[in-house]
Design a protein with these regions (language model features):
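Catalytic domains of riboflavin
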Residues: 1-194
């Protein structure tokens, strides 16, 4: 592709370049409210962001001062009604919200972004089935990521940037985050669930 572009005098842009351009020209997330909320892990700043595309409200818990120069402990958490509401430590629930809050509190500063979604009846029943399968030691089948689910990565990234995060210590299993540099974000470390 690079040879073809050179031969025909064309410019090549990366996915990160495209994302960077769109973030500068098309902001789709807006901070709409903020307050202090006491939790069992201390007082966090609760920040609400409105997604202008689907009108969804996403929430973030921020602890301490966030500096773009310092790596920040970060968890981007997809809301899961069953796992979050009942605080289960079940392995089918991925990383428990309370555990992420505890780790951020122990670190003294960090950000937890909760990307909200409205679980349908079918999705809740499927998650209940996954819990039952996992109890029997059967593998939980992977779910294909829908285009809407994939879009949430960009929403989470915009929220992190708005909160002042640039370098991240991510509370998650390692994963490939193509184009994250287009948001001026950098993953410096993945932190295991304790």
């Amino acid at each position: 592709l690079e040879v073809f572009a050179r031969e025909h005098g064309l410019k090549i842009g990366t996915i990160a370049d495209l994302i960077h351009y769109r973030v500068r020209t098309e902001k789709t997330v807006e901070r709409v409210s903020e307050c202090t909320i006491p939790t069992e892990y201390g007082d966090f700043r609760l920040v609400a962001h409105q997604d202008c595309v689907d009108n969804e409200l996403h929430l973030s818990l921020v602890l301490g001062e966030i500096s773009p120069e310092e790596p920040t402990l970060v968890r981007v958490h997809m809301q899961n009604t069953l796992c979050d509401l009942f605080s289960t430590g079940h392995n089918a629930c991925s990383w428990p919200m309370r555990r992420a809050m505890k780790q951020v509190a122990e670190a003294g500063r960090g950000v937890i972004v909760v990307l909200r979604n409205h679980d349908t009846t079918r999705e809740i029943i499927q998650r209940m089935h996954d819990l039952q399968l996992h109890d029997r030691s059967d593998p939980v089948p992977p779910r294909d990521a829908s285009p809407a689910h994939l879009r949430t990565f960009g929403v989470g990234a915009q929220i992190l940037v708005d909160l002042g995060v640039r370098k991240m210590r991510v509370l998650s299993a390692p994963k490939s985050l193509h184009g994250i540099s287009g948001f001026d974000l950098e993953v410096v470390e993945y932190v295991d669930c304790r």
